[in-house]
From Swiss-Prot:
Official protein name in the record: 2-succinyl-5-enolpyruvyl-6-hydroxy-3-cyclohexene-1-carboxylate synthase
Gene Ontology molecular-function annotations: 2-succinyl-5-enolpyruvyl-6-hydroxy-3-cyclohexene-1-carboxylic-acid synthase activity; magnesium ion binding; manganese ion binding; thiamine pyrophosphate binding
Cofactor-binding details, from the entry: Binds 1 thiamine pyrophosphate per subunit.
Pathway where it operates: Quinol/quinone metabolism; 1,4-dihydroxy-2-naphthoate biosynthesis; 1,4-dihydroxy-2-naphthoate from chorismate: step 2/7; Cofactor biosynthesis; phylloquinone biosynthesis
Catalytic activity: isochorismate + 2-oxoglutarate + H(+) = 5-enolpyruvoyl-6-hydroxy-2-succinyl-cyclohex-3-ene-1-carboxylate + CO2
EC number in record: 2.2.1.9
A Pfam family per the record: TPP_enzyme_N
Cofactor(s) the protein requires to work: Mg(2+); Mn(2+); thiamine diphosphate
NCBIfam families: menD
Highest taxon, organism lineage: Bacteria
General function of this protein: Catalyzes the thiamine diphosphate-dependent decarboxylation of 2-oxoglutarate and the subsequent addition of the resulting succinic semialdehyde-thiamine pyrophosphate anion to isochorismate to yield 2-succinyl-5-enolpyruvyl-6-hydroxy-3-cyclohexene-1-carboxylate (SEPHCHC).
EC class name: transferase
Length: 608
């Protein structure tokens, strides 16, 4: 759709310069493809808020808490894969966007942050609600600028339009991420006529002005159309392929991934694996585990396999897709063995925290496999060793989960993979849930779509991000798997529960504190001495009645007592609304159970 045939009624608001500026911004964003925006309340941002709220093609969602608003926008960006404008007033409001903006930068999601500001003459003079907002977010944005003050100049209108076009494009290219525009306004902030646009009366009276003015504004080229022209399999890369084909002790590492087309991604990895005859060690946050039948060399229990030294399974070469998997045992093995690493990742970041001998190949795996041979490689002893170990440990793990009747945090992840409806969007919180998914999530063919915040790996903003995913995928019910601390840390997100268009079921594992610390050395050391610090400073149990907290926000809450009751609660998932299903677990007992099982399973033989 082009600017010429994008026919709309007149959109510009000429009552004053600020309304003109705001309406021009909203109309430009609309023509670029914007359909959702997130707005936190405030006076200085009124011209932006009013314009976005009034635009018929943009759903402007009001969110009181700026931190929650920013993570909600991040969830919308993850689900829609489109830039989401995020608006706040001047002062400290924009600082609350920072955690989500960092996550967007680190994980590669497009946000267009619009911080309203006082004009320059009211800064650095204690005018109130004013801080230095220029380059507020340091080096994290893909691009950042301060807009000029609104002025009655035709060239200024063109400047604003093109700056917005550039800002929108920079949220997407060359790699998705946040962009920050600082937007100053003088009074009047309300949409009242003051005659300030009189010098532009000739434009206002021209019936063709808007059509002519916006004729070049249209959604930018999609990422897929840009990638289609890239052909990595050239002469200089054929040598890489020949080196891989000559190696019988290679592995493919598939880290966390949220590809636009999961099946295409999985098929590309399977093509690469079968052509090389290499096992694929797939992170629980990778779509590979949810399309298991497409990849015959899939390994899901590698963390348990590598908890014991098995030199016969150590790789000489590694193809790493994106970031490393979460597994600590895998990272320790790679650090010890120091294999030759080839990292396939279109992003330019340094993705090798182990500092192994690594070559960065700046391509997506879907691009790379387009030119490789179709003929599968033979099965090697090395590959068979991995497949045998996987089969043995997976069988023991699955049997243990099947036989277990009481609550266990790890079984929740395993159970969801067997019971969630196909293609369910599942947001997985950081800390213990993401590790239980890594350890226990089985291979399946349910095409479940994992969502997560693994850019900075924090527990902040989990609920709000999941609500954003649910709002963006409103035609398909969404599930959030979270612990009690992550839930409480972002409890202000509960206020969004009445606004979400769609469905979110929050599966809340309440183990009265930070269960992840029970698995770390601090759990043993921190319980020693006359005044042990572990419980108050690390486990940090919270005495909050979660049912009453949900009730205060109008969110239905239910404590689930059995696996059968959980199955009934999830079949079917509701089509609308937010609800909490709480499961009470014992973090100390569950931590010990993990340790016992991990020791038992990791000692299983793995000889081919």
């Amino acid at each position: 759709m082009t600017g010429e045939n994008f026919v709309l009624p007149r959109r510009l608001d000429w009552r004053n310069l600020n309304t003109l500026w705001g309406s021009l911004l909203a109309e430009t964003l609309s023509r670029l493809g914007c359909r959702l925006a997130v707005v936190s309340p405030g006076s200085r941002s009124a011209p932006l808020t009013y314009a976005l709220a009034q635009h018929p093609n943009i759903e402007a969602i009001p969110v009181l808490d700026e931190r929650s608003a920013a993570f909600f926008a991040l969830g919308l960006a993850q689900q829609t894969r489109q830039p989401i404008p995020l608006v706040c007033t001047s002062g400290s409001a924009g600082a609350h966007f920072f955690p989500a903006l960092i996550e967007a930068a680190e994980s590669g999601w497009p946000l267009l942050v619009l911080t309203a500001d006082r004009p320059p003459e009211l800064r650095h003079c204690r005018a109130g609600q004013a801080i230095d907002q220029v380059k507020l977010y340091g080096h994290y944005p893909n691009w950042q600028a301060e807009l000029a003050l609104p002025s009655a100049d035709p060239e200024a209108l063109a400047y604003l339009r093109q700056t917005l076009v550039h800002a929108w494009e920079r949220t997407l290219y060359p790699f998705p991420g946040p962009v920050h525009l600082n937007v100053p306004f003088r009074d009047p902030l309300a949409p009242i006529a003051d005659g300030s646009t009189a010098p532009l009366l000739h434009l206002q009276e021209d019936p063709e002005f808007e059509k002519t003015f916006f004729r070049g504004v249209a959604p930018p080229c999609t990422g897929s159309s840009l990638q289609a022209v890239r052909s990595p399999f050239q002469t200089e890369t054929v040598s890489f392929w020949q080196e891989w084909r000559g190696c019988e002790r290679g592995v493919i590492l598939a880290g966390p991934a949220q590809p636009a087309d999961p099946q295409r991604y999985v098929e590309a990895v399977a093509h690469l694996a079968t052509a090389l005859g290499w096992p694929v060690l797939a992170e629980g946050l990778s779509p590979l585990r949810n399309y298991a039948s497409l990849n015959p060399y899939l390994i899901t229990t590698y963390d348990l396999i590598l908890q014991r030294d098995r030199p016969q399974l150590w790789p000489e070469q590694v193809i790493q897709l994106g970031s490393l998997p979460t597994s600590k045992a895998l990272r320790q093995t790679l650090a010890k063995v120091a294999p030759r690493v080839w990292r396939l990742d279109p992003r330019p970041d340094n993705g090798d925290p182990l500092h192994n001998p690594t070559t960065h190949l700046p391509f997506a795996v879907e691009e790379w496999v387009a030119g490789i041979p179709e003929a599968p490689a033979k099965r090697t002893t090395f590959l068979q060793g991995w497949l045998t170990a996987e089969a043995q440990i997976r069988a023991a793990l699955d049997q243990a989960m099947t036989d277990l009747s009481e609550w266990f945090e790890g079984k929740v992840a395993w159970w969801l993979a067997h019971h969630l409806p196909p293609e369910t969007p599942l947001f997985i919180a950081n800390s213990t849930p993401v590790r239980d998914v890594e350890w226990f999530w089985p291979p399946n063919d349910r095409r479940i779509r994992p969502y997560f915040n693994r850019g900075t790996n924090g527990i902040d903003g989990i609920l709000s991000t999941a609500l954003g995913v649910a709002h963006g995928s409103h035609k398909r019910p969404t599930v959030l798997l979270t612990g009690d601390l992550a839930f409480l840390h972002d409890s202000s997100g509960l206020r969004l529960g009445q606004q979400v268009r769609g469905s979110l079921t929050i599966l809340l594992i309440n183990n009265q504190g930070g269960g992840i610390f029970e698995l770390l050395p601090i759990a043993e050391v921190g319980r020693q001495g006359p005044d042990p610090p572990f419980e108050p400073y690390f486990a940090t149990p919270q005495l909050v009645d979660l049912a009453l907290l949900c009730q205060a926000h109008g969110i239905p809450h239910r404590r689930v007592e059995s696996w059968q009751e959980l199955a009934q609660a999830l079949d079917p998932l509701p089509a609308q609304g937010v609800r909490v299903l709480e499961i009470l677990t014992d973090r100390k007992a569950d931590a010990q159970r993990r340790r016992d099982w991990f020791q038992q399973w990791s000692e299983l033989p793995s000889k081919p």
